[in-house]
């Protein structure tokens, strides 16, 4: 079911969002259409959305209150994700999940109602207290009916691939002028070997580099601490005007439009 779209200023459409970290998103102030693999999920306000790592999505977001941010996002780093996965495997008596199984969008992106009290506890935990965060997230998941798909998705998101190793190398210094040759040297193999291994995972060097640069740029914009020219240099693009064009082509919005919408005002 489609929701009613109102004024254009209340709405934004963003394309090509790569989920690099397993993400739990709470639609505190928006209604969101999520598009992936030619499917669409409509998520109404005050819902939880579980986004599997590695999923590429486009979203259309409509705010309820213009002066507030549209959602709250919890992005799980690798260590938190692994600890969460290990705990869930023990609690629910699961040994492993078939990572080669053909899985549709409904098993990679899941939405559910949320207990507001549990969510508030999660938001109020100190950002450096990983153990408390993991415990609260486990408890929240335990209160969700039919949570098997969520646990399966967390397990699969914790699996590391060769492309992840390439990302980790690049992420250490995004400002560097990366080439396939530099990556090959880092792994002490040929460029052809790098190319073939990435192709076996349905990706390539240029795609990984662009996704990392654009994802980092989006996060830096949300921090509201840097000028466009600074962000451009931080992600390895020397020209600010070129960065704006690339950002617009990738996401379908300019950096200014992106920042203005998500800053909450």
Curated annotation (Swiss-Prot):
UniProtKB keywords: Activator, DNA-binding, Plasmid, Transcription, Transcription regulation
Function: Transcriptional activator of the CFA/I adhesin (cfaA and cfaB) genes of enterotoxigenic E.coli at 37 degrees Celsius. Also represses the silencing effect of H-NS (hns).
HTH araC/xylS-type domain mapped to chain residues: 164-261
A molecular function (GO) term: sequence-specific DNA binding
Disruption phenotype: No longer transcribes cfaB; in a strain that also has an H-NS (hns) deletion cfaB is still transcribed.
DNA-binding region (UniProt annotation): 181-202, 228-251
Gene that produces this protein: cfaD
PANTHER family: ARAC-FAMILY TRANSCRIPTIONAL REGULATOR, RCS-SPECIFIC HTH-TYPE TRANSCRIPTIONAL ACTIVATOR RCLR
Induction comment from the UniProt entry of this chain: Transcribed at 37 but not 20 degrees Celsius.
Record text on subunit structure and interactions: Homodimer.
Organism this protein belongs to: Escherichia coli
One Pfam family from the record: HTH_18
PROSITE patterns referenced in this protein's UniProt entry, alphabetically: HTH_ARAC_FAMILY_1, HTH_ARAC_FAMILY_2
Protein name according to UniProt: HTH-type transcriptional activator CfaD
SUPFAM superfamilies attached to this UniProt entry: Homeodomain-like
């Amino acid at each position: 079911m489609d929701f009613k779209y109102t004024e254009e200023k209340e709405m934004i459409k963003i394309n090509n969002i790569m989920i690099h970290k397993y993400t739990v998103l709470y639609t505190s102030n928006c209604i969101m259409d999520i598009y992936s693999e030619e499917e669409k999920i409509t998520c109404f306000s005050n819902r939880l959305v579980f986004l599997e790592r590695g999923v590429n999505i486009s979203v259309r977001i409509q705010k309820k209150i213009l002066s507030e941010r549209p959602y709250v996002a919890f992005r799980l780093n690798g260590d938190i994700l692994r600890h969460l996965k290990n705990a869930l495997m023990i609690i629910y008596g699961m040994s492993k999940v078939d990572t080669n199984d053909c899985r549709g969008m409904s098993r990679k992106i899941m939405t559910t109602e949320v207990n507001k009290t549990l969510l508030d506890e999660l938001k109020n935990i100190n950002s450096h207290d990983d153990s408390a965060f993991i415990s609260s997230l486990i408890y929240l998941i335990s209160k969700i009916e039919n949570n098997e798909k969520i646990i399966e998705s967390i397990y699969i998101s914790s699996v590391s691939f060769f492309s992840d190793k390439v990302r980790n190398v690049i992420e250490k210094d995004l400002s560097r002028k990366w080439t396939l040759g530099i990556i090959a040297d880092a792994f002490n193999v040929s460029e052809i070997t790098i190319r073939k291994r990435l192709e076996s995972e349905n990706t390539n060097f240029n795609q990984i580099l662009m996704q990392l640069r654009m994802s980092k740029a989006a996060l830096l914009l949300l921090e509201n601490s840097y000028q466009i020219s600074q962000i451009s240099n931080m992600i390895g693009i020397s020209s600010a005007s070129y960065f704006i064009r690339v950002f617009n082509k990738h996401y379908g919005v300019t950096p200014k439009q992106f920042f203005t919408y998500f800053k909450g005002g």
